[in-house]
């Protein structure tokens, strides 16, 4: 089970309809588009990552099919590595194109995967949450993931910075990291 953590105190978050709340009563509203902002309080009010135009440009580019082969290969590999009820993080999920394919591939195995998308760009996760309403999406830094230790079966890291120590912290023993980088 995914263990989201409070970026203020580190306590475990629980979802209460449209809010995530920890035992210390810190609360984080789920936006209408379906994502929650879990960036540290010191980062509030600042723009991080891609803006609306950059996200729209990436979405338009990916919709032209140039990366369909890669998207399919990533989704197929995820389905091979993870069980049908796996806890999976798309670290640096962007606007959710890969996340959608990953979810569909895992769900096709007949299970109920728990999929989390995290990106530092609130605009990107806003779009991702609309693309994959079955997932949990948060604006968060992959350098300081708001996740409990050893809570993930698989981390997917596509064209995003590698945060090796942080990824090792949140991966379960025997978990996998699927990384895609340009050659």
Regions of interest found by a model, annotated:
Residues 143-154:
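A short acidic, Gly/Pro-enriched loop at the edge of an enzyme's catalytic core
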Residues 1-48:
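N-terminal auxiliary segments of SAM/dcSAM-dependent transferases
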Residues 176-183:
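Conserved class I S-adenosyl-L-methionine
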Residues 80-87:
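Short helix-loop-beta connector
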Residues 153-166, 181:
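A short SAM/SAH-binding and catalytic strip from SAM-dependent methyltransferases
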Residues 87-89, 94-144:
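Class I SAM-dependent methyltransferase SAM/SAH-binding core
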Residues 49-73, 77:
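Class I SAM-dependent methyltransferase Rossmann-like catalytic core
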Residues 164-176:
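A short glycine-rich, Lys/Arg-flanked "PGG" loop and its adjoining helix->strand segment in the class I
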């Amino acid at each position: 089970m995914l263990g989201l953590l409070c970026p203020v105190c580190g306590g475990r978050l629980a979802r209460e309809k449209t809010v995530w709340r920890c035992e210390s009563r810190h609360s984080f509203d789920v936006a209408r588009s379906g994502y929650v902002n879990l960036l540290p309080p010191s980062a509030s009010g600042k723009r991080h990552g891609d803006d609306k135009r950059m996200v729209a440009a990436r979405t338009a580019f990916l919709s032209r099919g140039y990366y369909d082969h890669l998207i399919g290969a990533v989704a197929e590999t995820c389905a091979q590595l993870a069980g049908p009820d796996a806890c999976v993080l798309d670290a640096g999920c962007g606007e959710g194109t890969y996340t959608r394919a990953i979810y569909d591939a895992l769900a096709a195995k007949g299970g109920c995967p728990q999929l989390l998308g995290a990106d530092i760009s609130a605009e990107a996760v806003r779009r991702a949450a609309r693309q994959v309403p079955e997932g949990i999406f948060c604006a968060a830094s992959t350098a300081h993931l708001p996740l409990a230790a050893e809570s993930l079966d698989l981390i997917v890291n596509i064209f995003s910075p590698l945060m090796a120590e942080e990824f090792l912290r949140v991966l379960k023993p025997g978990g996998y990291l699927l990384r895609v980088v340009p050659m």
